[in-house]
UniProtKB/Swiss-Prot annotation:
Pfam families in alphabetical order: F-box (PF00646), LRR_At5g56370 (PF24758)
Key words of the record: Leucine-rich repeat, Repeat
Name the record gives this protein: Putative F-box/LRR-repeat protein At3g59160
Residue ranges occupied by any F-box domain in the UniProt entry: 12-60
Superkingdom of the source species: Eukaryota
Per-repeat ranges for LRR: 172-198, 200-225, 233-258, 336-367, 368-393, 408-433
């Protein structure tokens, strides 16, 4: 048996010979619970824990499924008990907060890079008497990355100091079921990345604008489920912004009744990447995407608009039930574009004109049997430099006069053939097909013979 401290005579414990700074760096890649367990090794390791620059706390990591056991870290003064899933949450609350308190006390005022806290429970809310002091402590220590995933429920508010911190570079707030946050005063001069999920604002669109105005160096903004669709207007106006993810699709997947947002504006002249998912707005007063390189667009009509389309489309030509023209014109400089099936439908019924995409070289089309390709040909004709065309699925809706949706692989193949014959500059065509539905492989394989010599056709079966 090789001794844990000596591999052979004269050898040394290589790990213990490493400098403290390097060991602290290694510990920073572990969860705080894992890092704390190293304190059992020796007094030196407990000392190192006091200087770990990254702290990550997750209350779900403190649940044991079989029985309530005494945690050996308790003997080191770090934690009380680890409880079973069957134990009451109330008992757990005396263990996990105690662990966080002891770690923060152990570290004192040493510099801190990242503080991550996840406390999510479907039954009991977070105790604000515990969380608020933790946030204050790490902000005083100059934390640069603050990551909070919390079920707030009855928690009155986030500490206002979060939005008045000169050291924060990255801020993530995922607050479920909490009250609106108050952002009357915002001063985040170094903030580069802001990630908000399920966050509501006390003054809705005004509060959101105040928050952005207090972040003069912001480069990346991620918004998920912030309920902007119920605001009077929504404006993302940040001159320094380079990446924007704006996904307010909570009602789409919940099957809730949707209403069109009134006004949505984007004044982001330096933006290079956009991911936008939302029901179409009534108006897009300002769309400034002068530097945009890549865009992923998933916009859709409300159920009321879809019903109107189904009724009028049988008897009328060029039916328009909304206006997303300004948004589509605003992204005309992109090089890489991904459009959802719903967006294709918006182009058909809510876009008076499709602009010329002079820089577009790569297009990805997501297809579904519920949505047609009526606008696709016009889009491709207006993309003179297109080199790569990707179809994710070949099925789409073909509506006849009687309103019956006919789905046949032959119809899709004919349209793809047409794309190949009319796009001489195309260099690559990628087809993601469902082999259980798009069963006629012979027709798919024939596409290669129709393409120009420089166009590569790639067939990729979808994994189910």
């Amino acid at each position: 048996m090789v001794d844990s401290k000596r591999m052979d005579s004269g050898s040394k414990d290589m790990i213990n010979d490493l400098p403290d700074a390097l060991l602290c760096h290694v510990l920073s890649y572990l969860t705080t619970k894992e890092a704390a367990s190293t304190s059992l090794l020796s007094r030196r390791w407990r000392y190192l824990l006091a200087f770990v620059p990254n702290l990550e706390f997750d209350d779900s990591a403190y649940l044991h499924r079989d029985k309530r056991v005494k945690n050996p870290l308790h003997e080191k003064g770090l934690v009380g008990f680890v409880l079973t899933v069957d134990d009451k949450r109330k008992k757990l609350s005396t263990s996990f907060p105690d662990f966080v308190d002891r770690i923060l006390d152990l570290q004192g005022n040493s510099p801190l890079d990242k503080f991550s806290l996840k406390m999510v429970d479907d039954h009991d809310p977070v105790d604000p008497d515990c969380v608020a002091p933790w946030i204050h402590k790490v902000l005083v220590r100059g934390v640069s990355d603050l990551h909070l995933v919390i079920d707030m429920n009855e928690w009155t508010s986030l500490p206002a100091k979060i939005f008045l911190t000169e050291t924060l570079v990255k801020l993530t707030l995922k607050i479920r079921d909490g009250p609106p946050i108050d952002v009357k005063h915002v001063h985040l001069p170094k903030l580069k990345t802001l990630h908000l999920e399920s966050v509501m604002f006390d003054e809705e669109d005004i509060g959101f604008s105040k928050l952005l105005s207090g972040c003069p160096e912001l480069e990346e903004l991620v918004l998920h489920h912030i309920w902007s669709c119920v605001w009077t207007s929504c404006s993302v106006s940040v001159a320094t912004l380079k990446r924007l993810t704006f996904c307010c699709n909570n009602m789409k997947f919940c099957g809730m009744h949707e209403e069109n947002p009134n006004n949505v504006s984007f004044d982001t002249p330096n933006l290079v990447y956009l991911e936008y998912a939302e029901v179409i707005a009534n108006n897009y007063p300002k769309v400034n995407f002068d530097s945009l390189v890549e865009a992923k667009i998933d916009i859709w009509m409300t159920n009321d608009q879809l019903d109107e389309v189904r009724i009028r489309d049988i008897y009328e030509k060029n039916v328009m039930v909304g206006n997303a023209t300004d948004l589509i014109v605003g992204i005309r400089n992109v090089r890489v574009l991904c459009l959802s099936a719903d967006t294709l439908e918006v182009l058909t019924y809510c876009c008076k004109q499709i602009p010329i995409f002079n820089n577009l070289t790569h297009v990805t089309i997501q297809s579904t049997p519920k949505v047609g390709w009526k606008s696709l040909l016009k889009l491709l004709k207006n993309s003179p430099k297109l080199q790569t065309l990707v179809f994710q699925g070949l099925l789409h809706r073909d509506t006849k006069e009687e309103g019956v949706a006919i789905i046949k692989i032959e119809k899709q193949i004919e349209k793809v053939k047409h794309f190949l014959e009319t796009m001489p500059h195309l260099e690559q065509l990628v087809l993601h097909y469902d082999s259980s539905i798009d069963g006629d492989m012979k027709q798919l394989l024939m596409l290669s013979s129709l393409a120009s010599p420089k166009c590569k056709v790639q067939l990729i079966p979808l994994v189910t």
